Amino acid sequence: MPPLLASTSSTSPLLLASRLRGGGGCGCGGAPLLHRTRRGFLAPSTTTTQTTRTSFAAMSWLGKLGLGGLGGSPRASAASAALAQGPDEDRPAAGNEFAQFGAGCFWGVELAFQRVPGVTRTEVGYSQGNLHDPTYEDVCTGATYHNEVVRVHYDVSACKFDDLLDVFWARHDPTTPNRQGNDVGTQYRSGIYYYTPEQEKAARESLEKQQKLLNRTIVTEILPAKRFYRAEEYHQQYLAKGGRFGFRQSAEKGCNDPIRCYG
């Protein structure tokens, strides 16, 4: 459900949201489990490979429904959590800065940012969790507390952080905790993860402005950016590449075509 906006002026975020969101929830929950090796992380012991696959798939879908709390992954440890909770130590290219956002399924969120003039690169991945080097399957359990995020590289001479914040607020409903549309789970929570004090200040000010436009409470978390784990290549620029069905969507700068998120 989109945010309930108190303002319907021609400059309100509602109009921008309608252009970027393309209606309703993302519905990206059907990504096939085809990615990196699981490294035996939390499937219970079973007698056959087929049973293991079935159990794992069931747990992944429980995670999608927010029911994946299994008491933590056996791969999780204090050392693993400390690594995952460390700062993002990557560095952007000269003249660029990083920004990081969680706003539901990262496929559609990434495409929205790809279209922003001045954005030079986007990556989808996992962050803010308690497991070092998680896989998509790990995150889908809901037990690692990672968020699906987009790390945006932007040219500071051509794009301002405020421009990215505008896209962030327009792209999703920031009032639904751990949910966007049909996608339910902590990996779909709303978050702005800042790299500099200036980004933090801008994020908090923008939240205050957005809250005045809404009649529901914003639940967006604003936290320091933590270690970024790039998602499997399958997920990168997923919609621009056409996804599973080959329906490519434009990543052209300034494009306002509705974003259709599909598995």
UniProtKB/Swiss-Prot annotation:
InterPro entries assigned: Met_Sox_Rdtase_MsrA_dom, Met_Sox_Rdtase_MsrA_sf, MsrA_MetSO_reductase
Entry EC no(s): 1.8.4.11
This protein's GO CC annotations: chloroplast; cytoplasm
GO biological process: cellular response to oxidative stress; response to oxidative stress; response to salt stress
Annotated protein name in UniProt: Peptide methionine sulfoxide reductase A4, chloroplastic
Organism: Oryza sativa subsp. japonica (Rice)
Recorded coiled-coil stretches: none
GO molecular function ontology, one term from the record: L-methionine-(S)-S-oxide reductase activity
UniProt lineage: Eukaryota, Viridiplantae, Streptophyta, Embryophyta, Tracheophyta
